[in-house]
């Protein structure tokens, strides 16, 4: 293949880079393969709908294979099948709270009923009365309502008491309990540090009472992210130091407020607390102590990292300045993640609907309990695996399209000497080039990520299934393999992004672009460490700033609630949303910095500033590199070594 051929490598070393000049289609076989794969995904969707799965999914069916709300045909050798359920439109489970999370099934008999019980039914007499008044029989079809109170008849064929109040799920005709206590054990499994139901209820009530504050803080994080993007565009030279100071103040402020609240709570007289509230007060004090210690540890670690990186922080200023100019000329880049997210949501909605259709597709089969399940037999049973691979590959393909679009727009900006000659819409021009020439390259790059991601997910599933059963050696090996595959996936993702940039520059196929990008990154190893990594770290500080600011605002707004234990869920929700919003905005800035760095490295490798070989880069960036090289030479021997790495690699003539 071209990825590893020595002849190809020799041609690459002699090949001239001609940015944006020659454009040709790349990796056409991979585009054809991807199109065929998508046709297969469409076949799975059509098959699942055409085989009647849509009616079983939407209307629901009972444990005997009868679809609710219609007349059914008799199934061979299956009792209670072939019933007329025209007036029984809802699925009712005799024990709706008995869920099997491992096998993703409801371990309960399902019946078609005329109405869901809107009030709790505590006795069999209540169940009988409900059937007589509403005409909705909640026991098995073989038992008459008059026989509900007979223990010998109703045992195992009537709902588990008490029957929780339920309501039909919109559009899906299933009776679902309206009381969340039915699912309390699953919430407790997620919140493992809580063993007292009263604490769990206080946490949930804290979220409900603070929903307006949570919504306001989420909007605040969105506004702060947009403000930070504006600051990055217009004051990039001082942005690094502003971020550093604000992060220090934000982390110190949040930590100080938590310790102040802890001291205030500890000094409060316990005699004034009624005995019933004493345990709650102790929980509050313990929660505040945990919050304060966690914030202190985070602040100390953050300070140590900033102390180590302080000498190299200045290296990012010039690169941030150029990136700010990119957003001035290409402001719509900020909204690129929203279009990508919208495309992902549409695909995921399609994928989930098809998955639900597949779950009710196939022939009726009687299981060990005598109930009906729908299973696909023969080669079609492997459609599940095909569908899962499609989820990963197409999702990675959509993300790769975003990377190629951003790379194409930034490359156009960088290699256009006169910025007044930029296309009217560089982003749309980049999308046009992607669709016309480079969809095959994107398909190949996303497939490589899929090849690494699938084994890692399989190992993670095996590890979760064997939890508590495997020995220490096997557990260590599994975790090591998962960790190695995760690292490989991250490295390949970074290489893929740079390969897309190389393709956007010179219109080469994926293998050639990946090889060229890898060689350039290796030749500029210290540049990658000193500029690219530090830039990413400063963007991370921007995310931390938004999270800390939003969290601090949340602490001040939630301070009126003296039950500090209930802070945990609202603060976690707000901080997670703030981080996701900040990541959504700043990830594009990070991507622009990465693309600019590769363009800069290629520019310095193939141009020397002489007539006919002028640099494309911004003068500010080149002046910064030269000044840094001189400063490092004056610093001594070690600095001279770094300077040799930082100076432009002039091409020998």
Curated annotation (Swiss-Prot):
Gene Ontology molecular-function annotations: antiporter activity; choline transmembrane transporter activity; ethanolamine transmembrane transporter activity
Residues with a covalently attached lipid (N-myristoyl glycine): 2
Catalytic activity: choline(out) + n H(+)(in) = choline(in) + n H(+)(out); ethanolamine(out) + n H(+)(in) = ethanolamine(in) + n H(+)(out)
GO terms of biological process kind: choline transport; ethanolamine transport; transmembrane transport
GO cellular-component term (any): mitochondrial outer membrane
Spans through the membrane: 30-50, 212-232, 238-258, 288-308, 315-335, 338-358, 380-400, 537-557, 566-586
Mitochondrial intermembrane face residues: 51-211, 259-287, 336-337, 401-536, 587-653
Tissue specificity remark: Specifically abundant in skeletal muscle (at protein level).
Location(s), subcellular: Cell membrane; Mitochondrion outer membrane
Keyword set, alphabetical order: Antiport, Cell membrane, Lipoprotein, Membrane, Mitochondrion, Mitochondrion outer membrane, Myristate, Phosphoprotein, Transmembrane, Transmembrane helix, Transport
Membrane-side (Cytoplasmic) residue stretches: 2-29, 233-237, 309-314, 359-379, 558-565
Membrane topology, from the record: Multi-pass membrane protein
Free-text function comment from the UniProt entry: Choline/H+ antiporter. Also acts as a high-affinity ethanolamine/H+ antiporter, regulating the supply of extracellular ethanolamine (Etn) for the CDP-Etn pathway, redistribute intracellular Etn and balance the CDP-Cho and CDP-Etn arms of the Kennedy pathway. Involved in membrane synthesis and myelin production.
Name this protein carries in UniProt: Choline transporter-like protein 1
Annotated organism of origin: Mus musculus
């Amino acid at each position: 293949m071209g990825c590893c051929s020595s002849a190809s490598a020799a041609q690459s070393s002699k090949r001239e880079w001609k940015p944006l000049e020659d454009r040709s289609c790349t990796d056409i076989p991979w585009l054809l393969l991807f199109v065929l794969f998508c046709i297969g995904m469409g076949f799975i969707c059509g098959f699942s709908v055409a085989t009647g799965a849509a009616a079983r999914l939407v209307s629901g069916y009972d444990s005997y294979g009868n679809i609710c709300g219609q007349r059914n045909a008799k199934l061979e050798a299956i009792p209670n099948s072939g019933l007329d359920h025209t007036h029984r439109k809802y699925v009712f489970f005799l024990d709706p709270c008995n869920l099997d999370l491992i096998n993703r099934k409801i371990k309960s008999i399902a019946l078609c009923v005329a109405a869901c019980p809107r009030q709790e039914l505590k006795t069999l007499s209540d169940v009988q009365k409900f059937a007589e008044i509403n005409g909705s029989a909640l026991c098995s079809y073989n038992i008459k309502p008059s026989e509900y109170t007979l223990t010998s008849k109703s045992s195992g064929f009537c709902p588990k008491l008490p029957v929780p109040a339920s309501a039909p799920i919109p559009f899906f005709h299933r009776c679902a309990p309206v009381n969340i206590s039915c699912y309390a054990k699953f919430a407790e499994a997620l919140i493992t540090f809580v063993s007292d139901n009263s604490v769990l209820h206080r946490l949930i009530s804290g979220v409900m009472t603070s929903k307006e504050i949570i919504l306001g803080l989420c909007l605040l994080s969105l506004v702060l992210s947009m403000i930070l993007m504006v600051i990055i565009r217009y004051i990039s030279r001082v942005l690094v130091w502003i971020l550093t100071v604000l992060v220090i103040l934000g982390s110190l402020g949040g930590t100080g407020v938590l310790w102040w609240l802890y001291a205030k709570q500890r000094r409060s007289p316990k005699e004034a607390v009624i005995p019933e509230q004493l345990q709650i007060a102790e929980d509050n004090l313990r929660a505040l102590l945990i919050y304060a210690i966690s914030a202190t540890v985070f602040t100390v670690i953050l300070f140590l990292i900033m102390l180590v990186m302080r000498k190299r922080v200045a290296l990012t200023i010039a690169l941030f300045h150029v990136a700010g100019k990119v957003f001035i000329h290409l402001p719509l880049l900020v909204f690129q993640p929203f279009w990508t997210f919208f495309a992902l949501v549409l695909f995921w909605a399609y994928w989930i609907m098809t998955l639900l259709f597949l779950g009710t597709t196939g022939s009726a089969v009687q299981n060990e309990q005598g109930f009906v399940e729908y299973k696909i037999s023969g080669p079609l049973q492997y459609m599940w695996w095909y569908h899962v691979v499609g989820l990963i590959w197409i999702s990675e393909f959509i993300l790769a399209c975003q990377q190629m679009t951003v790379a194409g727009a930034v490359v156009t900006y960088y290699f256009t000497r006169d910025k007044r000659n930029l296309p009217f819409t560089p982003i749309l021009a980049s999308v046009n080039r992607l669709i016309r020439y480079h969809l095959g390259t994107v398909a190949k790059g996303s497939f490589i990520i899929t090849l690494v991601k699938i084994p890692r997910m399989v190992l993670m599933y095996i590890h979760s299934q064997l939890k508590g059963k495997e020995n220490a050696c096997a557990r260590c090996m599994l975790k090591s393999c998962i960790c190695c595959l995760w690292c490989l996936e991250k490295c390949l993702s970074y290489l893929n992004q740079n390969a897309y940039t190389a393709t956007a520059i010179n219109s080469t196929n994926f293998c050639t672009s990946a090889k060229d990008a890898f060689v350039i990154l290796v030749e500029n190893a210290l540049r990658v460490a000193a500029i690219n990594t530090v830039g990413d770290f400063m963007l991370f500080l921007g995310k931390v700033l938004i999270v800390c600011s939003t969290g601090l605002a949340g602490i001040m707004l939630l301070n009126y609630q003296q039950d500090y234990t209930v802070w945990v869920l609202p603060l976690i929700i707000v901080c997670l949303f703030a981080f996701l919003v900040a990541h959504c905005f700043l990830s594009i800035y990070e991507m622009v910095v990465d693309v600019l760095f590769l363009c800069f490295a290629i520019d310095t490798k193939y141009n020397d500033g002489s007539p006919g070989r002028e640099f494309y880069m911004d003068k500010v960036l080149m002046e910064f590199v030269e000044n840094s090289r001189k400063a490092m030479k004056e610093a001594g021997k070690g600095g001279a070594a770094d300077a040799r790495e930082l100076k432009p690699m002039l091409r020998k003539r």
